[in-house]
Design a protein with these regions (language model features):
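Charged, alpha-helix-forming regions
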Residues: 1-192
């Protein structure tokens, strides 16, 4: 099988924990101070994560080599936009940049209700930015300077230890334009 064919297959299909699909992990519209219970775990979010955030996260994970244990995922925002929207026009680039910055600040707390323990993690530990950036100007960073992300260590462990996983056809997911339809598709892949 050619290298290009392998890359195409890897980019079209990703594995995600069932909890991310069969629960309201990503909502259609932003919902503040959200939490939900699944099994013996309560998931709390510090910010609203919508299906658009899910689309960015899923597409970022599609750049990860499944055989490389590194948490570093290298890509350009243009490549990410082309995967998500099939176009890297300025509107899509700006939308993707904003969603990336929001994902970097998103924190999730999982409370084990049986053992009365919890863990807090971020989905994206940090964004790789080419060159020096003033902290006050970070919100206005140019998309061309974003070179990839580092996935949070705890989030990677959750992805690797997920007892129940499901597959997501990224090409189908990205072809859906309606947020509601995307959220429904995300939900139903957990039951396939």
């Amino acid at each position: 099988m050619s290298r290009r064919k392998k890359e195409t297959i890897a980019n079209e299909f990703i594995i995600v924990p069932k909890d991310m699909a069969t629960t309201p992990f990503f909502t259609v519209t932003p919902q503040e101070n959200r939490s939900f219970i699944t099994g013996c775990r309560r998931w709390d979010f510090n910010m609203p994560l919508t299906i658009e955030h899910g689309a960015v996260l899923y597409n970022i994970l599609s750049f990860k080599d499944p055989f490389n244990p590194s948490r570093d995922i290298e890509f350009s925002v243009c490549e990410l936009c082309k995967r998500m929207f099939t176009s890297d026009n300025s509107e899509n680039l700006e939308k993707t940049r904003k969603l990336l910055l929001q994902l970097e600040t998103a924190k999730v707390r999982i409370v084990d209700l049986d053992k009365d323990r919890y863990q807090i993690f971020r989905l994206i530990e940090r964004i790789w930015i080419e060159g020096e950036v003033d902290k006050n100007l970070r919100e206005n960073i140019a998309t061309s300077r974003i070179k990839g992300v580092v996935i949070d260590k705890t989030f990677v462990e959750i992805l690797e230890k997920a007892a129940e996983i499901t597959g997501l056809n990224l090409q189908e997911f990205n072809s859906i334009r309606s947020k509601i339809a995307k959220a429904i598709y995300n939900y139903f892949i957990g039951y396939i």
